[in-house]
Amino acid sequence: MLEGQQLPRVQYTDMDDNMKNEVMDICNAACDTHSNNNEICAKTIKEILDKRFGPSWHVIVGEGFGFEISYEVKKMLYMFSARFSAVAVWKCS
């Protein structure tokens, strides 16, 4: 599926470039640090995003999932990390 594609890679976002780059850095760092535990990785990302951008952020980290969500405009990112995990983050207060 991702063979031959550059990672990290954004699958979808409506964030502006500054926020997108910052959120991608946060997600990649958490995925690198917690590469063996998706739950701790997701919790770490959520805590950082809540502090940096205000609550309430929601995070999914893993492989083989689908999702359909409501979210605040300009507050959604779906990406593949450098560790091949998919990461979806969105804000919905």
Residue ranges and their predicted role:
Residues 1-93:
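Charged, amphipathic alpha-helical regulatory modules used
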